Every structure is written in C-alpha cells, then in structure tokens.
C-alpha cells in the first residue's frame, strides 16, 4: 500500500519594516516551486480586526481583490493568483476579525462546554484550522504538495502574536521536517558610513526566537547587492545555514524576483530541506514572460483616470492587467496617473489626456471626482481615443453618453444624486436595504464570478473570441433597464448582459463611431495573468497601439492646399 504523501508547510514572516515585499517573495517562491512540477497553494494571515478589507479606505489598504467565490481579500491574494496562475478561494485570506467572530459565535452556541475562552488554545486552534483547510483537496480532488502561508504585519506587532504562535504549533503538529520558516528582513544602507547594517535583521530574528520560531532561511531585502562576507555574518549571528541567507536587492520588475531568488538558490535549498522531489525549474513560460518584459518592440501610453491615484496599490490589479496586455503585443505600457478631479473642465481634460494613446476609467465609490471621470470620457469619446471602463467606469460611460448622445442632460446615478431626474444608473434590487442602513454594508455587494452573454460580432465578443464569458464583480449599482431603449437609439450598444438579459454587463460604441469605446460592469483585471493576459486588456492595448500608429502616419497635403497656405 503506497505511503500517504506528507504536505509541506512554508511560513513567510517579515521583520524590521513593513512593505518589504513579503507577498511578492512568497509568490515568487510559489512560482519557482510550481515550475519544478509541484502543486502549490497559498494563504495570507492578516492581523487586522476587520473581517475583510471590503469596507476599508483604499488609501489605507490598497485594492480589494475579489476571488471567484466572492471573497473580498487582501491585494496579496492577487499576487498569489498571478504568480501561481491559478484561482484561489476565500480560504486564502484569514483575518483576526474572521477568527474572533468564529470563536465568539462558537462560545455563544455553547460549543466550548463552559471552558474559559482564551487566545491559547481557542484563538490559535481556530487559526490552525484555517491553515489546515488549505491542505485539503481542491474542487478537482487534487491535494497540494506545498502550502505557503504569509503572516501579515511585522514580527513584534502585538496583533501578529496569535498567528505566529499558531504557526509554531503547526510545526509541532506536522513535524519539523515538514515545515520551513522563511523570514524576510531589511538590511538598510547607511550613506554616511557607506555600510549595509545587519543589526536590525539580527534583532528581528531574535524576536522570532523569543516566541519559539527559528527561521530556516532569510531573504535580505536591500537597495543593492550584499557582499558574501556580510551574508556569512548574518548566517553566523542568526544561526542560519549559509545557503539559507538569500540576497534580494531591488529588481527592475516584480517578475524578475523568481529569477533573483533562484540565482541565490532559495528554491533548491527549500526543496532539499523539505525532502521534496528535485526537478529542474522549467523556465519556458516565465522566461518568455521576462523576454517580453525587458525587450518590448513598442511603447504605448495609457492614462489611468482615478480617484485614488495617490496610492497606486489601490489599482494594483488594473496596472498589472494593463502591463500584461502590453506583454501580449511585446509593448511596454507606460501608465500616466491622472487624478479624476483634473478632468472636470474641457481644458483640464485636454491638458491631462492629449498625447495619450488610451484612457482607462477604473472602479471606485462615491461622488468625489465623478464629474472629472465624465470629463475624461467625454474627451476620449470625442477625440477617438481608445477607452476602457471598469465597473464604475462603465457606469460613468453610460452617464456621459446619456447626457451627450441621448439628450438626458440631468442623467446621473442614484449613488451620486437621490432623487435623480434621469437615474440611468440605479441601485440593484437586493441592495436597497444596505443603502438605507437596514443591512450590513460589509460583504453584501454583488461579489464573485457571474456569467454573461455577448452579442455576436460586437467589439467585446471579438476581443474574447467567444460569446459566453464569466467575470468577477463587486458592485451595488447597475444600468437602469428603463433607459436601455432610449440609450440604444442614441447609439450606445449593450453588447453583453446576464444570461437572463436583466443585467447589463458590457456596453460599447459601434466601430464606425469609435475605434474602441468599451465598458464592463465586471472587474476583468482580477483574472488577468502576466503569462495569460486578459483578452479585454489585450484588445484595449492593441487598439491603443493602432491609435498611436495612426497618429504617427505622415499626412499628405495636396498642392492646392500648400499653395493656399503659402499665400496666406
């Protein structure tokens, strides 16, 4: 009888400072192990008390990444999906809010049989249960070889302690030979002395050891290469094998990180330590990606007109989907961050958008900056600039075309104006109690993957290459069906709807009116992969490239025109 395969656990922690790139490090390691033929899944443990990031300010948290099954998760889950090239579920993100809610609910039901409910063992047991779920077979019945779990926050944070203790207990439960602790730390460079300093990393590792965790390997983040003697010093002072000290200086692209970690031998070291099957990394797919990243044959400039552009992480999946769309055409996408407020006037929109090859209107919430988004759409529509609207972007496209083409000057959304003379965008039927405050706001939007039917021959159908698609959603408002006929007569094409025809999913202008003017109620950026660009983004970038090429074409001026010009 064959011996049951043991699932390996890799825990990724961070020290010294936040925003070191733990998520990208973990994702890159996952990509390397996947390229070695291993089945990898990933999880993020977030120490904040929010149940999920769905109600958090984008300026504080960045984007909310929505999974296929409708979970609102941390943006690192997006990194995991893009690097692993696989869909994850709601189990991939665990927060303190979820853990405490579950434990308190059990206590109220009497499941603890009168025990005093404590952080240890009740909270830690709940965290361990969430970690164990990741080791179970997926919907296809396949069990992972490796579960990579990233612990959010920084070692030393009070709120991280229960999660770190749970990880320590998992090592005890499954055996030390089946666990690997990877610690990401900062090695700062002090310009006055001209030195890289190891003391912060030593203190960070000491803090980990104080709670019973000895890291097996260290990823040392720095703005420059680490000398070998410095790596040997870190290995000695932190009690880590020399092969386990990995230098990870800043890379030109996030997609270079797997190559950097591989060149330092991290994946080979981990495979040996965990006794995993040793196969060479297959670079065929990722190598082709890096070739497209670093050797573009063309460039294209896209304006991203948003409300949260001061924090680019608020649009992380959008920017990566745009870049991936460029990779599909061996083009480098240069993103111009345009605050939507600057486009409220015609002159402001012209100043911000002239010279752009494409305009993207991303999602968002609230009335601030909406007139600027409408101004940007108006400029792009009237100047024939390829335009893509996502979620709120579609709604703004509908409002703008209703005002400009259908003669509904007071057209608006009930999100921004209530009551509204022409509510071309209205609250979804099952969302009225949320808007009125009678139901919780968190986790109640239309979330997750939903199917759509596309009109054959439409721009979106040709982009997808099919007429039945499914995309992820996150919204409370929709196109008001009572205005669909009037908008259609004005020239707006409803090129995709829900299978029952009730919900508008895609709109566009005909090709004879505009080269590419497409909006979707969905968030297609969430399904884009660097190695498999989303077809809608690939089509948008292609339209931008064609627009750029047309702008550069020489213009023939007839002799009569030249003569009349000369005589003026």
UniProtKB/Swiss-Prot annotation:
Q: Which molecular function GO terms apply here?
A: ATP binding; CTP synthase activity; glutaminase activity; identical protein binding; metal ion binding
Q: How is its activity regulated?
A: Allosterically activated by GTP, when glutamine is the substrate; GTP has no effect on the reaction when ammonia is the substrate. The allosteric effector GTP functions by stabilizing the protein conformation that binds the tetrahedral intermediate(s) formed during glutamine hydrolysis. Inhibited by the product CTP, via allosteric rather than competitive inhibition.
UniProt binding sites for ATP: 19-24, 76
* Source domain of life: Bacteria
Q: What is the designated name of this protein?
A: CTP synthase
Q: Which GO terms describe its biological process?
A: 'de novo' CTP biosynthetic process; pyrimidine nucleobase biosynthetic process
Provide the binding site for Mg(2+).
76, 150
The record's similarity note reads:
Belongs to the CTP synthase family.
Assembly behavior: Homotetramer.
- Provide the alphabetized UniProt keywords: ATP-binding, Glutamine amidotransferase, Ligase, Magnesium, Metal-binding, Nucleotide-binding, Pyrimidine biosynthesis
Entry binding sites for L-glutamine: 364, 392-395, 415, 476
Q: Does the entry feature the keyword Transmembrane helix, yes or no?
A: no
Further remark? CTPSs have evolved a hybrid strategy for distinguishing between UTP and CTP. The overlapping regions of the product feedback inhibitory and substrate sites recognize a common feature in both compounds, the triphosphate moiety. To differentiate isosteric substrate and product pyrimidine rings, an additional pocket far from the expected kinase/ligase catalytic site, specifically recognizes the cytosine and ribose portions of the product inhibitor.
Give the enzyme's main class according to its UniProt record, as a single word: ligase
Q: What is its EC number?
A: 6.3.4.2
Please name the source species: Saccharopolyspora erythraea (strain ATCC 11635 / DSM 40517 / JCM 4748 / NBRC 13426 / NCIMB 8594 / NRRL 2338)
Q: Which residues form the active site?
A: 391 (nucleophile), 523, 525
One matching Pfam family, short form? CTP_synth_N
Give the function comment from the record: Catalyzes the ATP-dependent amination of UTP to CTP with either L-glutamine or ammonia as the source of nitrogen. Regulates intracellular CTP levels through interactions with the four ribonucleotide triphosphates.
């Amino acid at each position: 009888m064959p011996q049951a395969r043991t699932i390996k656990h890799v825990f990724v922690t961070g020290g010294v400072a936040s925003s070191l790139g733990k998520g990208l490090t973990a994702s890159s390691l996952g990509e390397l192990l996947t390229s070695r033929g291993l089945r990898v899944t990933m999880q993020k443990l977030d120490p904040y008390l929010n149940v999920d990031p769905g109600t958090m300010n984008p300026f504080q948290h960045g984007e909310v990444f929505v999974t296929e099954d409708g979970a609102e998760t941390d943006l690192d889950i997006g990194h995991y999906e893009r690097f692993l090239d696989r869909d994850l579920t709601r189990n991939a993100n665990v927060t303190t809010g979820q853990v405490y809610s579950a434990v308190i609910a059990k206590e109220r039901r009497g499941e603890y049989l009168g025990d005093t409910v404590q952080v240890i063992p009740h909270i830690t047991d709940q965290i361990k249960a969430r970690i164990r779920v990741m080791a179970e077979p997926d919907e296809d019945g396949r069990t992972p070889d490796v579960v990579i779990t990233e612990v959010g926050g920084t070692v030393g944070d009070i709120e991280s302690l229960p999660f770190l203790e749970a990880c320590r207990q998992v090592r005890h439960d499954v055996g030390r030979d089946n666990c690997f602790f990877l610690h990401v730390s900062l090695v700062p460079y002090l310009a006055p002395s001209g030195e890289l300093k190891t003391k912060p990393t030593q203190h960070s590792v000491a803090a980990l050891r104080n709670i019973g965790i000895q890291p097996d390997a260290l990823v040392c983040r720095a703005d420059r290469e680490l000398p070998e003697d410095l790596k040997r010093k870190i290995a000695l002072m932190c009690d880590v094998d020399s092969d386990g000290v990995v230098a990870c200086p800043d890379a030109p692209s996030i997609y270079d990180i797997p190559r950097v970690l591989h060149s330092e031998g991290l994946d080979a070291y981990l495979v040996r330590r965990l006794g995993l099957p040793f196969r060479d990394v297959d670079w065929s797919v990722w190598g082709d990606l890096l070739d497209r990243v670093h050797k573009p044959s063309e460039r294209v400039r896209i304006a991203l007109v948003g409300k949260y552009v001061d924090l680019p992480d608020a649009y992380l999946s959008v920017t990566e989907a745009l870049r991936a769309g460029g990779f599909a055409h061996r083009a480098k996408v240069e993103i111009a961050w345009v605050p939507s407020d600057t486009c409220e006037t015609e002159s402001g929109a012209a100043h911000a958008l002239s010279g752009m090859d494409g305009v993207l209107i991303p999602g968002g919430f609230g009335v601030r900056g909406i007139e600027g988004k409408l101004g940007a759409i108006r400029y792009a529509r009237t100047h024939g600039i390829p335009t893509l609207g996502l979620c709120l972007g579609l709604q703004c496209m509908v409002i703008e075309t209703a005002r400009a083409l259908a003669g509904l000057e007071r057209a608006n959304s009930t999100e921004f104006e209530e009551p509204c003379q022409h509510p071309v965008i209205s609250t979804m039927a099952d969302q009225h109690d949320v808007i009125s405050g009678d139901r919780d706001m968190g986790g109640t939007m239309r979330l997750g993957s939903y199917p759509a039917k596309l009109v054959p021959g439409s721009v979106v159908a040709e982009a997808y290459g099919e007429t039945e698609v499914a995309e992820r959603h996150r919204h409370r408002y929709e196109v008001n069906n009572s205005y669909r006929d009037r908008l259609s007569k004005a020239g707006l094409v409803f090129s995709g709807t829900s299978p029952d025809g009730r919900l508008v999913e895609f709109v566009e202008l005909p090709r004879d009116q505009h080269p590419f003017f497409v909006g979707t109620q969905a968030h297609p950026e969430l399904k884009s992969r660097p190695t498999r660009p989303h077809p809608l983004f690939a089509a948008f970038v292609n339209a931008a490239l064609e627009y750029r090429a047309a702008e550069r074409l020489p213009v023939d001026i007839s002799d009569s025109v030249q003569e009349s010009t000369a005589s003026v």
